[in-house]
Each structure stands twice: as C-alpha cells, then as structure tokens.
From Swiss-Prot:
Keyword Endoplasmic reticulum found: no
Keyword entries, A-Z: Cell membrane, Membrane, Nitrate assimilation, Transmembrane, Transmembrane helix, Transport
Gene from which the chain derives: narT
TM ranges: 14-34, 45-65, 69-89, 97-117, 139-159, 161-181, 211-231, 246-266, 268-288, 294-314, 331-351, 353-373
Protein name: Probable nitrate transporter NarT
Example GO biological process: nitrate assimilation
Topology of this chain in the membrane: Multi-pass membrane protein
Amino acid sequence: MYKTKGGFQLTLQTLSLVVGFMAWSIIAPLMPFIKQDVNVTEGQISIILAIPVILGSVLRVPFGYLTNIVGAKWVFFTSFIVLLFPIFFLSQAQTPGMLMASGFFLGVGGAIFSVGVTSVPKYFPKEKVGLANGIYGMGNIGTAVSSFLAPPIAGIIGWQTTVRSYLIIIALFALIMFIFGDTQERKIKVPLMAQMKTLSKNYKLYYLSYWYFITFGAFVAFGIFLPNYLVNHFGIDKVDAGIRSGVFIALATFLRPIGGILGDKFNAVKVLMIDFVVMIIGAIILGISDHIALFTVGCLTISICAGIGNGLIFKLVPSYFSNEAGSANGIVSMMGGLGGFFPPLVITYVANLTGSSHLAFIFLAVFGCIALFTMRHLYQKEYGSLKNG
C-alpha cells in the first residue's frame, strides 16, 4: 500500500490531519494554564472549549465538496494558511471574548477531516477503503499530541509561547502540501444541489450521521472536557490530566483502523451494533462512578468503542454514496463534529442543576440505545434477518 502513489498521499494527508487536529484542540489541554491569566468562569470555559467544534463541523460539508472539485492539495494548503491567524490571535488572548474568537476560527483545523475521507478512497480498491480511511482517521491523534505535549511545554515556557510554536509547524505543512500534494487527483464535478437532492432522499445518510454524532461526538467531547473535568472533580494535577486525556484520545485513534478492518472483513452494521452495546455499558459505568478508578474504566470503554465505531462508519459511507462521496462525507463528519459541541455544555448544565454530572453520561447511554434501533432497521432492510450476514 505505501509503495504506491496512493500510499504516499495517504501518509501525507494523514500527517496533515494530525497537524490540523493539533491546532483544533490546542485550547482544551491548555485551559488549566490559560484560566490562571485570563479571568473566565466555569460557564465561559465550557463555551470556549466547545466553540472550535462549530466551524470545525459546519465547514466539513463545503470542504468535502471542494475536495472533489479542486483536489485535497489546495484545500489542505489554504486551510493551513488560514490557521496561522487564529493561532497567533490565541497567543495574544487576554479576555474570554478573544479566546472565543480565536477558538471559533481554529475550527478550520477540524474541518479538514472531510478532505482526506473524500480524497483517500480514490487511490484504493473498494476492499481496502475501510483500512485506508481508518489509517487516515488516525490523524485524529493530533488531539492527543496536544494533550500530551502542550501542558508540560506550557509549564516550562508558558502557554502563550507554546501556542506560538504551532505557527512553525502549520507553516511547514503548508509548504509541504504545496510541494508534494497531488495535482492529478481525480475530480468529481457533480453539481452540489443535485448531490444534496439525492442525499436528502436516502435514509441511510440520516442514520450514519446520527451514529457518527455519537461515536465521533464522544471522541471530541471527551477530549475537550476531560482535562478541566479531571482537575476540578478529582483534583488531578494539570499535566497528569492532560496525559490521561491524551491516553483516551490515542486509544480511540489507534483503534479506528481496526474498525475499518473489521468493516472490510465482516458485516459492518452488525459489528457496529455490538460496538454500541459495549459503549452503552461504558456510559452507564460513567453514570454511576464517583471514584477515579471506575471513571477511568468507563472512559477507556467509551474510547475503545468510539474509535472502532468511527472506523466502521467511514467504511460504510463511501460504499453507500460512491457518486456523492464528498458531500456525504462532509455531512456525516459535520454531524460527528457537532456531536462534540453539545456534551461539554450539557455536562456543565447538569452539574450546575443537580450537583453531579452523572445524568449527562446516562444521556449518552440513551442516545446509544436509540442508535441500536436504527441499526436494526437498516440491517433488516439491507440484509434481512440478523441471522444473515
């Protein structure tokens, strides 16, 4: 795989996704440091942490479409140039408003996810798409890189200088993509409105979007709220909290290709149903945990299932929507991103209302149960009885 042109582009785009996600997620692991210099309330913190998800989700639809029109090279390159501005602005932030504004435009780093999942399948045969997209999805590890490295570096050189150091990395990858990006990538120029009309009539798009809303939403949400949550609720050291959050993110990321492989080898919908059953159990564990050990078990369970689930879903998307892949990838990945926006806000609201966050995790279990019913419906329409496939 890696000796081919596709293998090279897969590697390049995966590394580009790493950098994009590093930028997208930079605020969360540094928030314990930022709030020492910027006067912010817990309510404002939850909003600041969630805001990058908005643009990072909404832009996934046009980014996926544009990738089919102009190619991944130019969408990645332009995104990196744009990211330089909010990164610098964040390093100068002195008010909650400045943090929110910079965080909003950092969403560009999250939006580039739909670029690769649209471009990468063009280089591989159908039976390898699940694995290829799973490998590309490992670029999510950029979130873990920020969680692992940003806090200890900030402890040495300060959070502002840590943020500015990202400017070098992003500028470097803009140059690399400009030089090595594929200008010969196959273009698919189906009119956007025609694609949307076709997609809007296909119930599978709604189901896949909802499932990804849960799996990728959990991945994003836990990465956002865990550092601050662990410090505030369990009294964990800031650096240790960043490392624990990084473990959650890394585990989910490395298991994503496993989900793709399972989807290539077995019936992806049936495997996804098993995955969601285990995720529901993990959510229930979180809903009853008051001790850090039990909370850790619940988090790791969610991490495993979110990672495998993400890989399985993006095995299904290109197989169901080959002619509208760019727009379908954009819509599904947008819903996944939005799935990461609401949980931190809900957790904060529930904690303020009840004095505990337990009920918020039970909501995740309920959402998972609803997803199981939709999976059963799709499976029976596509394959008949669950005993088949």
